[in-house]
Structures are given as structure tokens and as C-alpha cells.
């Protein structure tokens, strides 16, 4: 199984931040050329909150945002209670972006939902994602090396991973810290829409640990 680890973050950072030579040649590089080395996003299939199978492959040709969430996590609550996450979801989807929100909490752990609770999740949180995907085994979360909630990935229309990490630069659970925060996801989507390489392709994630079965056992 392929795993998207911090090595991918290193590749992303290298593409965005390669040092210039002391005597630089004239720049003729296109955005397409500068993204050629970006890692491919692993394809996966999960069942959504309505019981329908959704594959990442279905959205090839679209920009895709992946968000890991856990409604019991104070760091997630910070973004949802203020409506900030939902506002970003609406902005993105209005521009044609596919937004996949994933719950990787194991059964019996904080954030796990199924059945009617999963079907009611969007209305409960005023969510504006495209699909809510359920990952109770944690297989997809671990495939993407997601360790915290919230945790974000952005995939470009060619299926390349162009952003990995935290949603912003304020690693707190305080709503007031949203004011003036640098939202890396919004900035990355703006770069993509403008045809530019993503200026900040990796940011340190923060939040609650994702409740994989082995994570819960280790914390017990």
C-alpha cells in the first residue's frame, strides 16, 4: 500500500522553495512544468453518509479538497462553531471544487458516526462539503498519513497532491484566533485557480489525534 508521508511534504516544499542560483537564468518555466514532480494522490473508495460508494477517481479533472474531521475535537469545533469551515467549503464548491470530508474515527471512539447520525451530520453542522465519507477502519486516513483533525489535502485536476497539512497558522482551539489567521487552504485554492504553483504546499498540522484503533489503545 502506498502511503503519503512527510516525504511527500518534503517534495512539495522542494518544488515550491528551491533556491535560486547566484546567477539566475531568465525564467521561462510554466506552471505545468513546475508541478511535474508533484506526488500522485493515492486513489481510494469509501462509502458516503448516504451509503453510496465514492471513488477519488470519479473526480479526476477537478480540484479536490480532503478534510479530516471529528465533531468532538475542540480544534475542529473552533472552525465549525464560527462558521469558518463551512464558509470555506461554500467558497470552494461554488468554484467547482470537490470537497470530501472524511471521518476516520474508529467505532466506539470520539467522532465516530454511522447510520442515521451520519445522514444527519451535514444538517447538524451546516456542512457544505460535497460528500461526507466514512472511514471507520482508518485505511484511507493512514494511506494519506493523516494524524490530526482538522487535517487537509488538496489534489489538483491532474491528480497530484499540491497541499498537505494544517488549515491555517493558528494552532489553537480558540475561535478568536481565526481573526487574522493565514488560511493555507484558501490561499492554495487561489493559487490553483490563477494557474500558479501553490506558494505554501505544506504547513504543520495541528489538532486532536485521529482516533484510529491503535491510536486509542496507545492513549489508554
Task: Name each model feature, range by range.
Residues 1-6:
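Bacterial N-terminal signal peptides that target proteins for export
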Residues 57-77, 99, 189:
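Short active-site neighborhood of thiol/selenol oxidoreductases, capturing the structured segment around
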Residues 17-21:
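Bacterial signal peptide processing site
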Residues 77-125, 136-142:
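Structural microenvironment flanking redox-active thiols in thiol-disulfide oxidoreductases
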Residues 24-56:
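N-terminal "domain-start" segment that seeds a small globular fold
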Residues 154-220:
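Thiol-/selenol-based redox modules, centered on thioredoxin-like
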Residues 119-156, 161-162:
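Short, internal strand/loop/helix patches
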